[in-house]
């Protein structure tokens, strides 16, 4: 039965939940909004599969990189619409053109971050750009295994703990599986992200606030609308801020008195917000 001596060591990858043959594991948010596994002990058969797939308990081997490359997409539009150099788009396009499936993080209709699949170029675009929030993996490991057994080429992108969780879950090396680790130093919880968006979209009507955070200016432009008013979220806006500064932008349907439809424009994200 899955149990870590330090609860906070859990990365929330969901490998244990998806591998459990009795479906007796479920995830629940704690007071900080992070997802942690709980076990229905009355249904557990102590098979130990949940512990075998856990990337915290079974960290695997440390592999040394064979080669290191610096890469960027040649298409400027794709680079501007990406968080960095647009490499994910090229990898995803290659896999889809081969009849494969791409898995990555996307926003759902409530702007929460979830892993989902893309089998066409239209469905690939929502997976572009980094989302600096813990994603809900859902049942994607099971889906990946199904596609791999069908012989399809699969690309799975995620944080290092999610990738290791997937590989432990599969328990088999597949030549038709490509994985891309996103370098991660920790992310805010889904609960904190949800609360942030709710507070952001319920500020005083058309109020413009300018505050100083560690010497950096943050502009808030908002009206009292629900999260459904949001039309786009970009953690790395480049057309307005360029490549040197980090610009976090939330777009909404209505327009403020200043003529901007941006809820939040900020350049403080190159600093430690805490």
Regions found by a protein language model. Give the residues of each.
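Iron-sulfur cluster-binding cysteine motifs and their immediate structural context
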Residues: 2-6, 15-32, 36-38, 48-65
